[in-house]
């Protein structure tokens, strides 16, 4: 069954353009490194400044494989440290949605 991975974060007020640029670079890297197509979405209604990257995979094992590579050091230094000061600490949320139909 297909799964959708959603990582959302709350951008720091006044840092929206820089946070958006950072996420665009991260999405480009995901495509180049893993062939993953990701969407960038903004919350419409609710908490202002919440933004999310969304990917779809065939199964959770693919998400875990990518996660392990990233944790293992695959993320370039500019992406590993580039988010500092752009997002509110403690406000990043990961969700995995299972497609049932």
Q: Where are the regions that the model predicts?
A:
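Absolute protein N-terminus
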Residues: 1-2, 101
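Active-site-flanking beta-strand signature of metal-NTP-handling nucleotidyl enzymes
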Residues: 2-10
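Short hydrophobic/aromatic beta-strand micro-patches
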Residues: 10, 54-56
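Short, surface-exposed ligand-recognition loops at beta-strand->loop->(often short) alpha-helix junctions
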Residues: 10-21
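An amphipathic, aromatic/His-enriched active-site/gating alpha helix that lines ligand/cofactor pockets
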Residues: 21-44, 56-93
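Short acidic/glycine-enriched loop/turn segments that link adjacent beta-strands
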Residues: 46-49
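Short, low-order "capping/linker" segments at domain edges
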Residues: 92-101
């Amino acid at each position: 069954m297909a799964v959708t991975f959603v990582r959302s974060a709350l951008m720091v007020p006044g840092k929206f353009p820089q946070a958006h640029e950072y996420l665009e670079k991260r999405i480009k890297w995901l495509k180049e490194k893993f062939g993953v197509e990701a969407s960038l979405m903004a919350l419409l209604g609710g908490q202002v400044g919440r933004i999310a990257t969304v990917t779809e995979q065939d199964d959770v094992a693919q998400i875990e494989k990518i996660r392990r590579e990233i944790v293992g050091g695959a993320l370039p230094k500019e992406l590993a440290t580039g988010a500092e000061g752009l997002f509110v600490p403690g406000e990043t949320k990961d969700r995995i949605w299972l497609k049932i139909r």
